[in-house]
Design a protein with these regions (language model features):
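Predominant activation on well-ordered alpha-helical scaffold segments within soluble catalytic domains
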Residues: 36-44, 67-68, 188, 217-225
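Phosphate/diphosphate ligand-binding glycine-rich loop within oxidoreductases
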Residues: 1-51
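Short helix-loop-beta connector
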Residues: 46-53, 77-78, 141-142
Length: 229
């Protein structure tokens, strides 16, 4: 629990020029780390300039990978309040895992509204969300960045958040309210400096940035190259 992937991944790596099978890989680590990496990239790119309170729900392997990647790119002396939703012993285990980072102040909360309230960045990595995570839209503060890694439970936010960003339009074009998004762009447009990451620190932004198959291949290629040198 907490560090065992809920989904198992295997990967076949081929040489594109010849069709030769190079490797059959257990891709659990690749899946969780590339997902964590793209989520951390979205946070680093799209968060408000004053973000200091980060909320996490769903504290399994994907959330752990996201925190690991986020800590690798945020300033090590930046004070961070990290709010965790209590579930079994996962919140306490998550906090213990990152206890060596003295700039982190962990707070465990007991309900969804407390997690959302006053959070600058909200990361959801739950695998199931049968209903809306937080129906009170007023609790999503101005400037909040919402990162639903597994996409579920935030349909109400699709309707009133100022901007929706995704790594691939195809990932979200089938969403119920896609045609009612106030504004939509792909993250690549931001990374290529075609559009600004934020128009203001009061914009509410959702980042459906969950990773592409190309990221899996990129990771697998570098792992294969290192093992076969």
């Amino acid at each position: 629990a907490g560090n065992k992937p809920s989904l198992h991944s295997d990967l076949l790596l081929y040489q594109a020029s010849t069709g030769e099978l190079l490797s059959f890989m257990d891709a659990d680590w690749i899946t969780q780390m590339r997902t964590g990496a793209v989520a951390a990239l979205a946070i680093h790119t799209l968060q408000s300039s004053t973000a200091s309170t980060y909320a996490f729900v769903g504290l399994g392997s994907t959330a752990i990978a996201t925190m690991q990647c986020l800590l690798a790119i945020l300033p090590t002396d930046k004070p961070i309040t990290c709010k965790l939703l209590r579930y079994k012993q996962q919140a306490e285990q998550f906090a213990q895992l990152f206890a060596e980072h003295t700039n982190l102040d962990f707070i465990v909360v007991d309900d969804h509204e407390d997690l959302v309230r006053d959070s600058d960045v909200i990361v959801s990595a739950v695998t199931e969300m049968p209903s809306l995570f937080c129906e009170n839209n007023d609790l999503y503060k101005e400037g909040v960045l919402l990162v639903p890694i597994h996409t579920r439970g935030f349909q109400n936010c699709d309707l009133f958040f100022d901007r929706i960003i995704a790594d691939d339009k195809a990932h979200v074009s089938g969403f119920k309210y896609f045609n009612q998004f106030k504004s939509f762009n792909e993250l690549s447009e931001v990374l290529l400096n075609r559009i600004p990451a934020r128009l203001s620190d009061t914009e509410r932004i959702i980042a459906y940035n969950i990773g592409l198959g190309l990221h899996d291949i990129y990771f697998a290629h570098h792992i294969y190259e290192r093992l076969t040198r």
